[in-house]
């Protein structure tokens, strides 16, 4: 089991479905740069935006993803950053389990979202289009 899988298992059943934030940060940080992007990348960026900027819980992010999945469309291109943050699942796992590790997950999300900040207006437009938030 690699560090991502271990962190994934750790978050299963944690309060507010923080597993969703782990999935979103990991997808955005590790996806191959390609345009048009895979739907998972768009959903990950939307999830990070909603969590970091709007304070959405993992459950609320998952519900937003459900709304977006109902309408098929082509997705806008992503501006791919050269660096996507220094934190990784291994960094997060180095923090003792519990509230401190959960806060480290939030810090990881913030770092990855910051790396993708050139996509903020595109993501905000999608949020408006789907009337989320």
Model-identified regions with their sequence ranges:
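Intrinsically disordered, low-complexity linkers and terminal regions
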Residues: 2-133
């Amino acid at each position: 089991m690699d560090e991502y899988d271990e962190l994934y298992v750790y978050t299963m059943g944690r309060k507010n479905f923080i597993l969703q934030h782990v999935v979103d940060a990991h997808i955005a940080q590790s996806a191959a740069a390609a345009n048009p992007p895979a739907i998972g990348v768009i959903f990950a960026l939307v999830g990070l935006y909603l969590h970091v900027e709007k304070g959405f819980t993992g459950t609320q992010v998952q519900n937003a993803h459900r709304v977006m999945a109902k309408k098929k469309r082509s997705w806008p291109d992503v501006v791919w950053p050269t660096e996507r943050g220094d934190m990784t699942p291994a960094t997060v796992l180095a923090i003792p389990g519990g509230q401190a590790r959960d806060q480290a997950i939030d810090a990881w999300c913030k770092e990855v979202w910051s790396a993708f900040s050139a996509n903020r207006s595109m993501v905000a437009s999608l949020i408006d289009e789907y009337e989320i938030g």
